[in-house]
């Protein structure tokens, strides 16, 4: 994937979610949950501070993260794959 996020932006590919209920029923449409976890595919150079310095991001390519998909999260198709473009501040945790 050829994409380079700017500043404190992160590109995340959402993890697949089990589409069956505990009883084995296949869930579709609004009944199927979307995961709030994903793999970091690319990171920007960092957040620009008021003094002009750049603070590197805490996450790196390959990290599995839990994110808050709220206002400001952009969905895009890159090379046929749906990815999320979000700020590092939308990430809540690194798993593992």
From Swiss-Prot:
SMART domains: Cpn10. Keywords: Chaperone, Cytoplasm. It comes from the Bacteria. GO terms for cellular component: cytoplasm. CDD domains: cpn10. It is found in: Cytoplasm. InterPro entries: Chaperonin_GroES, Chaperonin_GroES_sf, Chaprnonin_Cpn10_CS, GroES-like_sf. The keyword Glycosyltransferase does not apply. GO terms for molecular function: ATP binding; metal ion binding; protein folding chaperone; protein-folding chaperone binding; unfolded protein binding. GO terms for biological process: chaperone cofactor-dependent protein refolding. Belongs to the GroES chaperonin family. Heptamer of 7 subunits arranged in a ring. Interacts with the chaperonin GroEL. Together with the chaperonin GroEL, plays an essential role in assisting protein folding. The GroEL-GroES system forms a nano-cage that allows encapsulation of the non-native substrate proteins and provides a physical environment optimized to promote and accelerate protein folding. GroES binds to the apical surface of the GroEL ring, thereby capping the opening of the GroEL channel. NCBIfam families: PRK00364.1-1, PRK00364.1-2, PRK00364.2-2. This is Co-chaperonin GroES. It comes from Shewanella halifaxensis (strain HAW-EB4). The lineage of its organism: Bacteria, Pseudomonadati, Pseudomonadota, Gammaproteobacteria, Alteromonadales. The gene is groES.
């Amino acid at each position: 994937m050829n994409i380079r996020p700017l500043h404190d932006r992160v590109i995340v590919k959402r993890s697949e979610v089990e589409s069956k209920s505990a009883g084995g029923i296949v869930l579709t449409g609004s009944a199927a949950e979307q995961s709030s976890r994903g793999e970091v595919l690319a990171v920007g150079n960092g957040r620009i501070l008021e003094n002009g310095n750049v603070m590197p991001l805490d996450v790196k390519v390959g990290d599995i993260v839990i994110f808050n998909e709220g206002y400001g999260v952009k969905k895009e198709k890159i090379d046929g794959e749906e990815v999320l473009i979000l700020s590092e501040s939308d990430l809540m945790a690194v798993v593992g």
